[in-house]
């Protein structure tokens, strides 16, 4: 009897060990992924979809930790306000420094964030171009042509969209460069916005209005949005590169208060740092952003510097380098530009009243 009882105990112990090991194994299989939230702007959807998969694999290989990056996209200005008002972003990858400053001013991002990463925390750049319909029926060649009677312009709203602010500043720079006075520049830009048929809240909305809904004659667009249109609708659209534009510097930052609360500081830092690696810089170029690594950017520079682009170059060399681009310093920095042009009662409000 004692032997039988001992045998039963032994069997129960063995079964218990097997159950425990099975449970541990199943727990490992269903291990919860660490979540990282990236709040970005409209025109980055395709790029971050690819980048996030690349980063998740990289991080797992480096640490053994499974990560899931959750994306949020929308007009950059609107996205910044959402984060400032409590949307729990670990990182932001917004259209411009001024939008990140909105979050910083709420105490969620540390002062000096602009120096956390290379090139003023801008891992890729862009510029502003025009997208027109096949054959360029309104003969759009430069900013002056957007003022012509009968030309219907599509652009997003600079009160909600970071890309729209770059659009506005590019137009302002062009007319200023023509030797116009401040009053004359404002009159020219006012006339341009009188021709705006639809003012969407974000860049992707404007692209949809123009390309899918068939409204307007010309779309003022992020360079990458324009090239994606050529890729998605071959033969239907053309890019016109204006003689003057702006150097758009999308800006990235950790949301320090959130990462400290979530314990994701190291993960968030790695996520943003990885944007500067060579393979990712090439991925950015393949998504029609300009890499900040000059050697890699040169790999994608066009030799023709064509002003009218009807298709994606077969050799992948799409970057037009011969453009006069003003950076935000020309306008006194984002604090000054926001106050002058985009604040309540600023120049845009006077123009588009």
Predicted regions and their residues:
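Ligand-binding pocket segment of bilobal, Venus flytrap-like solute-binding proteins
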Residues: 178-243
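Periplasmic-binding protein-like
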Residues: 122-127, 189-193, 200-201, 232-261, ...
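Alpha-to-beta junction loops
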Residues: 86-92, 150-152, 213-221
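Early extracytoplasmic/lumenal segment of secretory-pathway proteins
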Residues: 29-106, 116-117, 222
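Extracellular/periplasmic juxtamembrane helices and adjacent flexible linkers that interface
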Residues: 259-353
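A conserved helix-loop-strand patch within extracytoplasmic ligand-binding domains
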Residues: 104-176
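Single conserved hydrophobic/aromatic residue that forms the stacking wall/gate
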Residues: 1-10
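Sec-dependent N-terminal signal peptides of Gram-positive bacterial secreted proteins and lipoproteins
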Residues: 11-29
């Amino acid at each position: 009897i004692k032997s039988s009882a001992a045998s039963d105990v032994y069997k129960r112990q063995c079964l218990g060990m097997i159950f425990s090991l099975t449970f541990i194994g199943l727990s490992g299989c269903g291990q919860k992924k660490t979540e990282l939230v990236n709040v970005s702007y409209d025109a980055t959807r395709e790029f971050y979809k690819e980048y996030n998969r690349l980063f998740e694999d990289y991080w797992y290989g480096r640490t053994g930790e499974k990560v899931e990056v959750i994306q949020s996209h929308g007009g950059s200005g609107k996205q910044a306000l959402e984060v400032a008002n409590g949307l729990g972003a670990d990182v932001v990858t917004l259209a411009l420094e001024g939008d990140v400053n909105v979050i910083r001013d709420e105490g969620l991002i540390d002062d000096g964030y602009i120096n956390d990463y290379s090139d003023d925390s801008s891992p890729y750049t862009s510029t502003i171009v025009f997208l027109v319909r096949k054959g360029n029926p309104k003969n759009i060649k430069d900013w002056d042509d957007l003022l012509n009677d009968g030309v219907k312009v599509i652009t997003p709203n600079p009160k909600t969209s970071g890309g729209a602010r770059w659009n506005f500043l590019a137009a302002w720079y062009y007319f200023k460069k023509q030797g116009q006075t401040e009053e004359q520049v404002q009159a020219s830009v006012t006339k341009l916005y009188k021709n705006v048929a639809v003012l969407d809240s974000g860049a992707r909305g404007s692209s949809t209005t123009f390309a899918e809904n068939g409204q307007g004659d010309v779309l003022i667009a992020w360079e990458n949005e324009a090239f994606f249109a050529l890729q998605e609708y071959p033969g239907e659209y053309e890019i016109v590169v204006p003689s003057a534009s702006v150097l758009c510097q999308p800006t990235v930052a950790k949301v320090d208060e959130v990462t400290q609360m979530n314990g994701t500081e190291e993960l968030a830092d790695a996520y943003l740092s990885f944007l500067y690696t060579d393979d990712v810089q090439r991925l950015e170029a393949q998504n029609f952003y300009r890499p900040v690594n000059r050697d890699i950017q040169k790999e994608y520079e066009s030799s023709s510097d064509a002003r009218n682009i009807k298709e994606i170059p077969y050799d992948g060399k799409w970057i037009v380098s011969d453009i006069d681009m003003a950076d935000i310093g020309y306008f006194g920095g984002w604090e000054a530009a926001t106050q002058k042009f985009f604040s309540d009662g600023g120049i845009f409000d006077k123009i588009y009243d």
